[in-house]
Every structure is written in structure tokens, then in C-alpha cells.
Amino acid sequence: MTLITRRSVLGAAVLTAAVPVVADHDRAIAADADIDLAGWTLLGVGDEFTDPTHSSAQWHRGLWYPHSGSGLFRDANVSFSGGQLHLAARAEQVDSFSYTFGAVESVFDVPGLCTYVEVRAKALPSAARVLSAIWMQSSALDGGPSLLTGAEPNPELDVEETFDYTKMNIATHVWPDNTEVTHRRFGGHAYPVGVDISRDYHTYGVERRDGKLRFYFDRHLAWETKPGDPSLWRMSRHMVLSLEGHLGAPVVHRLPASFDIDYVRAWYAPNPALEPGDYRLTSADGRFLAFHDGVPTLQAQPQTWCVVRHDDCTYSLSTPGGAVLGLDA
């Protein structure tokens, strides 16, 4: 039997009346639009920042670009203490830069499909005018300038960037060649939260499944979107936490200051109701999905399909002869 690994058949030519190829999971959103993690599995990836030695090995200091605006990334601006990760912004002259920033990229992958990833953090104080960023992207962890080879189109999820401290500012991109020439922006959303987020700790989360991205502020749904590229909801990514110079010159007398991260956690979605096995797939009018002369069709006579679940939470349908719907049909 022909199987597919780590490949969705979302693009398969499935007839409208047939059962969807990708299982329709129960939504993780309760009636009040908050995510409900009951039944989800907390994964071992992430960091609670309770062990500085362990955390230091989990995070690469610096990014694949050496500076952001007038701020130079420095390893010394990254510290682990008090059960937290601290990224500092300082007014100090280093080379031609008047400021220094902290930034880290995880050495571990945050899984993609069928997951919810959450960061609890307190943004650097708004009065200092240094942007705090929570995002997902993967580099080679060698200081740059390239993103991870073989991970094209290099999807990027900006979960929060403090362009406006009273909003959760979200954006999505892909960087196929890691250049502006091929860079594609798919838009974003600014979700008003009604408070200055830098005054307290908040959670920032993203759920990736069912072909959708769902972003959460304090576990309240902030934005749901069908991304412009499937890699945005499928591919694993590194977690990036950084200070950026996108707000212009920092306010010197408000520095030093820090962006404080309490934890990074990831959950895996509850198992779907559909179990692997042999099925007959019917349409609303009682006809059966069948494979005839190399073409999927609806007919009166039933045909058995083998449903196979893959490790990325997708499914494939194959005939007894081994033809896979979406690949061979």
C-alpha cells in the first residue's frame, strides 16, 4: 500500500460530498471564544526557565542578523535568573551602535500542525521605546545571514510585536530565498487589548490546525485566519524572542530595561475521533466514494478505503490496490 509521510492531502481533488481527507478536529475554542486546553497534551519542548544551566543550552544568543535599528545584539544582554529569561536593552556605545539589545532563538523545534504554543511574558516598558517581539522562524543557529537550509519557504509567524502597546500585533510571512525579492507578506491583525501590555505579564499563543492559524491574547481568541501558505500552519519552527529597533531611537533615560519571559510551552491537540482502518465513505445522497478508471467518483456500489493517520496528524486515503487519493487520483 502506498503511504505518504509528513504530507497533507489537503489539495486532493476530493468530491464536495465526500468525507474530508483531513480529520475535522473538535475546535479548541469554548463558547466564550477562549481556548480550552482540557484534553491537550503538554509537550516536553519549551522552557520553564527554572534551571539556568539547562536554559542556557536551550537558547542560542543573537540572531542571524547582527543588529536591529540602532541596537546591537549582545550575548551579555541575555540572562536567566529568578525562573525567567531576561532580554535587556541598554544605552551604551559599542562600535558604531549607541544601544545594545538581547535576543535569543531556541535550539529546539516548536512543533507545527495540531499544536498550541504559548509564551507568558512582560514586554519591555513602553516608555523606553524598544520593541519586544515573540515570533517563530528558523535559522542555522550560526549567526547568519541565512535561514535554515531545507526549510523553505521559511514561514514566519509574528505572534506579538509591540508596535502599539495597547494591541496584540500579529503578522505572517514566508521568505523562500531569505531575500526581500521573494519575501511574501500575508497581512496581519492588530487586536485591541485595552491596556498597556508592558505593565504586566500576559500570555501570547498560537494554535495551528484545521488549515487555520488562531492567535490568542491571555487565551482569548484575537484573530483567526486561513494562511496564505500551508507551511505557516504545518511546519515546525524555532521560537524567537527579541528586542528590536523598529520604534526608532530608544528613550535613553528609560534604560536599562528588560523584556521578561516566564515560560514557553507547547501542547498537542487531542486525538481526533477518526481512527485508522477501513471505511466506506458516503455522500449525503447515499452514494459511495470510489476509484474508477483512475478517477475518484461517486457511485451506488460501495468501495472500501484504507484510512491511514500520519505522525503530523494528517490522513491519507488509499484503495485496496494502493492508489492514494490526492497523489494517484
Model-identified regions with their sequence ranges:
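C-terminal region of N-terminal signal peptides and the immediate post-cleavage residues
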Residues: V19-A33
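N-terminal secretory signal peptides and thylakoid transit peptides that target proteins
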Residues: M1-T16
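Beta-strand residues in well-ordered beta-sheet regions across diverse protein folds
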Residues: A88, R120, Y216, T282, ...
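Extracellular glycan-recognition/adhesion modules and their associated mucin-like linkers
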Residues: P272-G294, T304-A329
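GH16 jelly-roll
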Residues: V9, D32-P272
